[in-house]
């Protein structure tokens, strides 16, 4: 087992970035034994002597382990730096926070870019199919490695919320509290459809090369960029788009988008067009197309009820976890109706569950943005859970 570590105090809370190599590997649900297993992760704060103050934060589809410090690849602040840190709702002065790159990702955890032990070459598009259960099983191996028997909390938004629910279902004795945010216990037909259009955009790119594009010194940038553009629309709301862009045009269209983007064929470019092109072009510089395909498919497979005789209550009947389910009023990707369905199932299972719908016009991405009511909800739930757990947070 090899570990590389790099502690830092720059641009955020004190953290350590590590990659752990587990030679024992991981048995995937598809039947493939994946070995070795590498998991890249960051930790923030200090684990208490009782090892009872650990919070696992799970990232969304295109997130990574750089939760609260400057991302070394993009140079931008961590994706939840406004939420995680000293004195913030997820307080690193009190809690030991862990965030790992998911299985199938492209930021250090085993995924399509990794070398297949049998062939000596990168997996690329031949990386085996994975599920949300596989993703969580890899995280569980990391938590075992850290010597943590029970997580105080698992928190995640969007696909991160799917992971939080899977933790509570698959490890009912290892999670005291769970906060699934802007998520669902299944991936809807609409969301599967969005993902399929994204995948087809990648497949249609002439640089796709059946997923072995790196052998040709290429990446399917056009297709992956279009996939990101379309996905980004689903993360916003009509109100947010109207407020941010309206029907305004860019009079400097020639310099408004990177040179690699196709020029507008119809005169001046709308600001929303320029914005989407920027999102697409910046995304392809940091994310791998095969990882995008692998992870979106894992999301599509996700359906906790179908795996338990069609009854969503069944996976939680043995769970001792305390839940706080959070939705946002303008989120049409994971609408409040799906959160209510989850809450009703948790009630049937006899779980301790609270539900909060945050009024916001910012759409699905609201959980990543400044929302005072949401901040108070997270802070309050964590404090209440700590009280019920008799957690002596801050005594380290």
Curated annotation (Swiss-Prot):
Keywords: Acyltransferase, Amino-acid biosynthesis, Cytoplasm, Methionine biosynthesis, Transferase. The active site is at 158 (nucleophile), 331, 364. GO terms for molecular function: homoserine O-acetyltransferase activity. It is found in: Cytoplasm. One of its GO terms (cellular component) is cytoplasm. Gene3D superfamilies: 1.10.1740.110, alpha/beta hydrolase. Its main location: cytoplasm. Its EC number is 2.3.1.31. One of its GO terms (biological process) is methionine biosynthetic process. It is an enzyme of class 2 (transferase). Residues 53-370 form the AB hydrolase-1 domain. Pathway: Amino-acid biosynthesis; L-methionine biosynthesis via de novo pathway; O-acetyl-L-homoserine from L-homoserine: step 1/1. Belongs to the AB hydrolase superfamily. MetX family. Homodimer. Transfers an acetyl group from acetyl-CoA to L-homoserine, forming acetyl-L-homoserine. This is Homoserine O-acetyltransferase.
